Amino acid sequence: MDSTNTFLKNLDTYDEDALTIAVADYQTSGRGQGVHTWESEPGKNLLFSMMMCPKWVPLRQQFLLSEAGALAVKDALDSYTDGITLKWPNDVYWYDKKISGTLIETAIDSKGIKRCIFGIGIDVNQTEFHSDAPNPVSLAQILGHEVDREEVLQKVIEAFCKYYELLRRADYMDVSGIYHLSLYRRKGYHWYEDKDGKFEGAFVEVEDDGHLILHDKKGVIRSYAFGEIKFIVNS
């Protein structure tokens, strides 16, 4: 199929009270955040999307859904290796290497969130990468052997259901708190680049609407939306 997100988006009927999942061995048009594409060797990685109708999540706090999805991937990967963190806004890292990317698409109507589709790509068994992605890694490369993709999928789904239930109960601080503790570069100063150039910054928080807040070495607070800042790795 072209992409699991598109497949779910085009469904004519679905159960609004259930989690609907689409899985693919290969995607011809797999996407990451913005204009980025996702490289995946057929039959090697885990490519899937989950669709839900969380009408009870406040529109101004919809980034909580991204947090829940990213945490689910982290929990699943934590069972195989250490060093897993969440790189704002939508990547999962093993130390300084990217092992997973996520893409959330939300449909909104006059009442708030109508539907949410969360696309996930996890590098499971691919060992050679040919795109211009600077730092990919797979579970097989980390562990030295292949991993059952179905097992990884089940672990992600189980973890997501746990966090989704917390959101359903309006335990927003629990989800957000765990997300903050799981962030890549949560401590210390690191190199970043924005429209004005490179700078060293330290993490402050991720706001409810998803903005990343940093402060630089002059103490200036900086706020960024998606796509407005680049993480400089190994600088």
Language model feature labels by segment:
Residues 24, 84-88:
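General beta-strand structural signal in soluble alpha/beta enzymes
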Residues 55-60, 64-84, 94-235:
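Long, positively charged amphipathic alpha-helical accessory segments at protein N-termini or as interdomain linkers
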Residues 1-79, 146, 221:
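N-terminal lobe of the biotin/lipoate ligase/transferase fold
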Residues 16-17, 43, 87, 112, ...:
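A generic fold-level signal
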